[in-house]
C-alpha cells in the first residue's frame, strides 16, 4: 500500500491519518517522539505493510515481474494499488468523494508537520499541492512517480523498467486488487488491522 491506501484504511479504522502517512519516515520505536494516537497510526501502517506483502494475491503479482525488476516489485505494486484505489474511489468510497477526502486528510496531517522529519515535510510540500492522491488514477502519473523514485534513489533504478510489467499485467493486477482490497476495507472498519 502507498499513501492513498494507508490514509483510506486509517480513516476506515478511525486511526491517525498522520501516523499512517508518517510511518515510512520513522525508524525504530516512535513512542518517545510522537503522541499515542500518532504512534498507534504508525504501528497500524507497519501491520498493513506486513499483511499486504504476505497476501496470496500480492505474492502472485510479484511473480509476474521480470527477473530484472522483481527486486522492486513490492514498491511498484504499492504504487499500483493506489492507482486502482484512486481510479475506483467512487465505487469504494461513494459517500466521501476523493477530492473531499484529500482535503480532509491534508488537514489531519498538517497538525503534526511542525514536529516531523524534514523528508516528511518535503513530501507534504508536493503531495497536497500537486494533488498526487487524485492523480494516481492516471497511469502517466504512475510512470512519473516510479521515475521520480528511481531518480532520487539510484539503487532503485529498476523502478523505471517496472512500468512495463504493470502495463503487461494491468488487467490481472486490477483483478487482484478487487480480490483483496475490499477485504482490507472490511478489516479496517472492524478495527482488525
UniProtKB/Swiss-Prot annotation:
Its EC number is 3.1.4.14. Coiled coil: none annotated. One of its GO terms (biological process) is fatty acid biosynthetic process. The lineage of its organism: Bacteria, Pseudomonadati, Pseudomonadota, Gammaproteobacteria, Enterobacterales. It comes from the Bacteria. Converts holo-ACP to apo-ACP by hydrolytic cleavage of the phosphopantetheine prosthetic group from ACP. Belongs to the AcpH family. This is Acyl carrier protein phosphodiesterase. It comes from Escherichia fergusonii (strain ATCC 35469 / DSM 13698 / CCUG 18766 / IAM 14443 / JCM 21226 / LMG 7866 / NBRC 102419 / NCTC 12128 / CDC 0568-73). Keywords: Fatty acid biosynthesis, Fatty acid metabolism, Hydrolase, Lipid biosynthesis, Lipid metabolism. The keyword Ion transport does not apply.
Amino acid at each position: 500500500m502507498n499513501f492513498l491506501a494507508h490514509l483510506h484504511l486509517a480513516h476506515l479504522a478511525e486511526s491517525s491519518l498522520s501516523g499512517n502517512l508518517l510511518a515510512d519516515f520513522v525508524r525504530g520505536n516512535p513512542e518517545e517522539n510522537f503522541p499515542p494516537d500518532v504512534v498507534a497510526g504508525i504501528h497500524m501502517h507497519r501491520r498493513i505493510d506486513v499483511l499486504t506483502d504476505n497476501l496470496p494475491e500480492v505474492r502472485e503479482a510479484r511473480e509476474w515481474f521480470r527477473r530484472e525488476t522483481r527486486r522492486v516489485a513490492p514498491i511498484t505494486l504499492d504504487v499500483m494499488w493506489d492507482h486502482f484505489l484512486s481510479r475506483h474511489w467512487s465505487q469504494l468510497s461513494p459517500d466521501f468523494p476523493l477530492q473531499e477526502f484529500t482535503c480532509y486528510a491534508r488537514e489531519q496531517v498538517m497538525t503534526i508537520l511542525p514536529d516531523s522529519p524534514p523528508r516528511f515535510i518535503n513530501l507534504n510540500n508536493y503531495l497536497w499541492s500537486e494533488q498526487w492522491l487524485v492523480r494516481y488514477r492516471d497511469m502517466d502519473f504512475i510512470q512519473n512517480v516510479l521515475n521520480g523514485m528511481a531518480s532520487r534513489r539510484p539503487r532503485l533504478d529498476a523502478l523505471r523498467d517496472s512500468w512495463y510489467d504493470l502495463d503487461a499485467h494491468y488487467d490481472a493486477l486490477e483483478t487482484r486488487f478487487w480480490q483483496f482490497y475490499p477485504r482490507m476495507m472490511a478489516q479496517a472498519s472492524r478495527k482488525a488491522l
